[in-house]
């Protein structure tokens, strides 16, 4: 199968959708399919050979975060040329509601089109303003995929169409078999936080609020922080407890997996804006017990607390108590890790890719090719 994929978010910075697109493409290529990915990217960014840059992206607020997107008439022309230059059997557009390449690709293409909806937000100003304009383009979509029940529910309620639920994929062996970081295991306990720690919705303030209780029960505890942000500012906010913070910065996938394997607990105190929770699955694959906010998306991944502990949102005391219960009770830890090791098989990329291929098969039965719209 010759597959064209469109990613709306820039490959300049890591992100869940970018990782999903790249890893899915790699799995398909390993299986003998031909894949070309179109995505925003700067000239100085090293890209996989199957990724075509649509040009540099612009940072704009989107879904409670800052997304790096690409749009405009020049971009539209590049999309049409990319479609015309390739003889795709299917075009797979990720996040078709994002005001970037994906919206433009939906306008520019005709033929077998599959769309994956990653988010479940209804707060987008673009969608609120242009939903009527976008609806005819959404009707071009032959196959719809939602990565979670929340994203699927949004499809039904907001767009009046249904989607098959296929979760995000994870390279389970890469996390299960990762080596620990140099210097680990350390004498004390390690709690991992992963994400843009100065982005409020990631919940670092909640973890800082739990830190005094964690230090009291485990004086040698370390908060290992992986991700971008203002380190000096966070140290000031931590005050006298700043010595318990260790920063790795932005890392590659292999180092992220090693960090997860090195931690005693993975902590996800997010406040909202999550439709899935791929990092929870990665931690589960690494054999690291999870403590997470009881967001709907996290609750589903952790199977209502069977595969990880859930705590009320913005509750530092509950977060500290849950982390401590894992650190102090091997039976709790083993129960969570064992349940998680069974659950993660659902998210292994070979399983997920096969489900997506079946969607491709349903939209390509007529033998029609993807072409630039007239």
Describe the role of every protein-language-model region.
Residues 250-251, 258-263, 278:
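Short alpha-helical donor nucleotide-sugar binding micro-motif in glycosyltransferases
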Residues 304-305, 309-316, 325-331:
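Conserved acidic donor-binding segment of nucleotide-sugar-dependent glycosyltransferases
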Residues 265, 289-292:
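Short hydrophobic beta-strand element within catalytic cores of glycosyltransferases
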Residues 150, 169:
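Carbohydrate-associated surface elements
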Residues 235-255:
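Nucleotide-activated donor-binding/catalytic signature segment of Leloir-type glycosyltransferases, i.e.
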């Amino acid at each position: 199968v010759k597959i064209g994929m469109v990613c709306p978010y820039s490959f300049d910075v890591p992100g869940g959708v970018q990782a999903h697109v790249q890893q899915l493409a790699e799995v398909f290529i390993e299986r003998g399919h031909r894949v070309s990915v179109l995505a925003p990217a700067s000239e100085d960014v090293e890209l996989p050979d199957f990724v075509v840059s649509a040009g540099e992206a612009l940072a704009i607020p989107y879904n409670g975060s800052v997304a790096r997107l690409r749009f405009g008439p020049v971009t539209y022309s590049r999309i049409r040329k990319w479609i015309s230059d390739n003889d795709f059997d299917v075009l797979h557009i990720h996040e078709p509601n994002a005001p970037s390449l994906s919206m433009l690709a939906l306008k520019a293409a005709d033929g077998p089109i599959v769309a994956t909806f990653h988010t479940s937000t209804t707060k987008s100003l673009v969608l609120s303003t242009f939903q009527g304009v976008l609806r005819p383009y959404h009707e071009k979509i032959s196959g719809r995929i939602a990565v979670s029940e929340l994203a699927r529910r949004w499809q039904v309620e907001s767009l009046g169409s249904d989607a098959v639920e296929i979760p995000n994929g994870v390279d389970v062996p890469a996390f299960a078999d990762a080596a620990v970081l140099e210097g680990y295991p350390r004498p004390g306990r390690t709690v991992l936080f992963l994400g843009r720690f100065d982005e409020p919705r990631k919940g670092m303030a909640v973890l800082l609020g739990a830190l005094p209780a964690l230090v009291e029960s485990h004086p040698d505890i370390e908060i290992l922080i992986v991700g971008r942000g203002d380190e000096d500012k966070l140290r000031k906010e931590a005050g006298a407890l700043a010595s318990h913070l260790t920063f790795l910065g932005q890392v590659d996938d292999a180092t992220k997996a090693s960090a997860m394997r090195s931690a005693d607990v993975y902590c996800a105190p997010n406040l909202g804006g999550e439709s899935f929770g791929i990092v929870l699955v990665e931690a589960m694959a690494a054999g690291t017990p999870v403590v997470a906010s009881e967001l709907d998306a996290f609750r589903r991944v952790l199977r209502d607390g069977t595969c990880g502990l859930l705590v009320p949102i913005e509750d530092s005391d509950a977060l500290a108590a849950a982390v401590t219960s894992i650190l102090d009770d091997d039976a709790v830890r083993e129960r969570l890790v064992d349940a998680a090791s069974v659950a993660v098989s659902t998210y292994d990329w070979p399983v997920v890719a096969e489900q997506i291929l079946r969607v491709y098969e349903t939209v390509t039965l007529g033998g029609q090719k993807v072409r630039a719209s007239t």
